[in-house]
Amino acid sequence: MANLLFLCTGNAARSVMATVMLRSLCPEHHIRGAGTFSISGLPMSQRTRVALASFNLSDPNHRSHQLDDADCEWADLIMIFEKEHRDYIERHHPDSMAIVGSLPRLARELDDSDQSLSLRIAKLDLDKSAFDPWEEITDPAGGDQEIFDLCAKEISALLNQLALRF
């Protein structure tokens, strides 16, 4: 059983979608989300709720949460969506850099061997890798429902690949 954390900016869209989706794919793991610039206690955005509903998923109890030291200590893996999230962890939680990787990179590079998840993460040398433009999942905030739906589809496709490796 792994402790998996998704980190986005406000913990209202991308990390919420990913958390709810991965919980449905991997119920045996502990999965939660947080934000780098979040107002704690807010529900997910309405557009996020609708995007999740298109996958027959929901989390009516979600409340936004600002990333803190306890989250970083808890997590076996922190999955991010853009370079700014990596930069935030590097500034505020540098001891966690070895377990921080973008969702696209992890979906592409995490192997599915029988080794422990922590060993497979360590082999990626995430703290030494640069964040490349192909790794970004654009924040749908401020976009219309179609933008949120496209973001949810992108996240879902990546999680369907990655879930097989946990």
Q: How would you name each of these model-derived features?
A:
Residues 82-90:
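A short, active-site helix/loop in glycosyltransferases that binds the activated sugar's phosphate group
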Residues 90-166:
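Phosphate-binding/catalytic loops
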Residues 1-75, 83-84, 96, 164:
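Conserved active-site segments centered on acidic
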